[in-house]
Amino acid sequence: GVVGESGCGKTTLGRTILKLYHPDGGEIFFNGEELTHLSKSQMQKYRTKIQLIFQDPYSSLPPRMTVGNIISEAVKVHHIVPKDEVAMYVQEIMKKCGLPPQYYDRYPHEFSGGQRQRICIARALAVKPELVICDEPVSALDVSIQAQIINLLKELQNSMGLTYVFISHDLSVVKYITD
């Protein structure tokens, strides 16, 4: 877990791990490989292995795409499953994240914040990552929904063998979710 006050660089660290930002110094290793000096094309093979769950589920989902298209986009690009199995695979991921299959053809604006964050989680998990960077995944949600999402993340971590870099300003949340 990564804990710190607002503005201390927690999100920058998460995005730097993904090479969305270039570091000023230091090195980042993943599975024994140093990532900071990899080119864009060399980094491509890590795009499915490392995923990010954004802080704000309201702005991180494309409004003109259906839930099914949002989750399946990377599945198709990275050939996670054969084309004829994509819809069924995506619906299985949706179920794991607490989203009924009938949400497949609906749009993000039709959902609450908690449901949108479940869509974001499903999108991240759809490519079978080894590492998921959770950038304050509950800070934009109502307190009543925060516990549900944290419990979902913990359950998915245990059932799928996920490793999280959990970023938060709330020490108790990080303590609960981390090993």
Where in the sequence are the language-model features?
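Helix-to-loop junction immediately C-terminal to a conserved catalytic motif
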Residues: 18
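Conserved ABC transporter NBD signature motif
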Residues: 26-34
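Conserved ABC ATPase "signature" region
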Residues: 34, 85-102
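ABC ATPase NBD coupling module
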Residues: 35-51, 77
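Hydrophobic anchor residue at the start of the ABC signature
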Residues: 71, 121, 149
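Conserved ABC ATPase signature
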Residues: 107-111, 115
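A short, proline-enriched helix->beta-strand linker immediately N-terminal to the Walker B motif
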Residues: 126-130
